[in-house]
Swiss-Prot record:
Protein name, UniProt field: Cytochrome P450 716B1
Family statement drawn from the similarity comment of this UniProt entry: Belongs to the cytochrome P450 family.
EC numbers on record: 1.14.-.-
Xref: Gene3D superfamilies: Cytochrome P450
Amino acid sequence: MVWKEAVSVLQKAQELKEPPLMFTVFLASFIGLAFFFYLISNHRTKAWRGIPPGTFGWPLIGETLEFLGCQRKGNPRDFFDSRTQKYGNVFTTSLVGHPTVVFCSPEGNRFLFSNENKLVVNSWPSSVGNLFRSSLITTVGDDAKRLRRILMTFLRPEALREFVGRVDSMTKRHLAEHWIGKDEVMALPLLKRYTFSLACDLFASINTKDDLDRLWLHFMVFVKGVMQIPIDLPGTRYNKTKHAANAIRQQLGSIINERKIALEAGNASPEQDLLSFLLSNVDEQGESLTDNEIQDNILLLLYAGHDTSSSTLTVLLKFLAENPHCYEEVLREQLNIAGSKEEGQLLEWEDLQRMKYSWRVAQEALRLFPAVQGSFRKAIKEFIYDGFTIPKGWKLHWTVNSTHQKSEYFSNPEKFDPSRFEGEGPPPYTFVPFGGGPRMCPGNEFARMEILIFLHNIVKNFNWNLVNPLEKVIVDPMPAPVNGLPIKLVPHD
């Protein structure tokens, strides 16, 4: 197929009477590369006997364009469904420059989650690794365990409970400044700024308008290019993303230096945020994280802590507007909690534990529109799975799209039904919005806290209606309504 496409390009070029020199050079290079990689791909396919069925697609880019295209059309399942129907629940493809085996079943999820550091290790595409460098998402083995232990000390429930009142206070202030008194708002941009400000405050006490605005401008460029084909040429989205990441690191570096001075002078507390915690604590060997490690991990948590939560909160507002009976039940639960508080008293950790129905509503939103679509592993040795050979060094991909909306695991999968999560909930390894196993998202409790506190405050103040009930949700790289979810606010009397 590749060779035919190259010939087609050549035939079209011959229709030009005097093709420009640069075009001729580019065309010759393209045909040469296409033919070279066609030969390599053909040779490898013959050499890798017993691998799962599938196709590698185009040279270099593989099937990445179709993979991303399905997401941006709002149909991420299409990429996987078309291939599982043809090849089964384990198939071969090529994504972001890597031969990849995709696992599309609860059994596949369980296998990958339970074989971390045995047969597989966490391994995002190099395009992602180049952005997050020495962060938890890119490290493996002992380095990953060390980072996870340190970060989880801050993100565990026992530590987060101290921040509930702080998050509640910030949420009330955000609603007072941007929602209350408005007839209509654009939900997604407001929620992005809300979750970003929250993450900046809790992770690094970045809360002045100038610092937030400067970081925000770089971050909006950064988030658009995380899952992109890594074409690092001037003007490409990926190139802009790398420059934005460097600018964010530079700003974080200045903040780290200032915080070190403040800690030494006693003008900052070791418990005030993640940054102080990382600067004040050491690992089992008595070593502190380097400044680069701190920058990379705060960058990762700022990305994960704001973009995923704003996506979930936005689709949550959409689903509650579409399902008024669910809204009424959430409102009833939250008013009961509010009624148990003194005037002006902030929420506490114990209040979040009482928000059982509200969390089931959030879980159902995460089932239908999970913020993270899946992740990657790498085979550290050749092994057999389901009768197929998985070569050493290949990427492996698990995806929520293989289980979250499948009728085999969820009856009426398109229906919004929080009751699915009553009792024992869904079958094991079918509901995996935070992943699983040793690499399970360390921020899942942080996300839960953030979602429930916002939900408590928004339903206490408003009901709302969708301006465009038919607004489509796309995935780029996380679920987002195409027009930003404009809603009409209806304040409670």
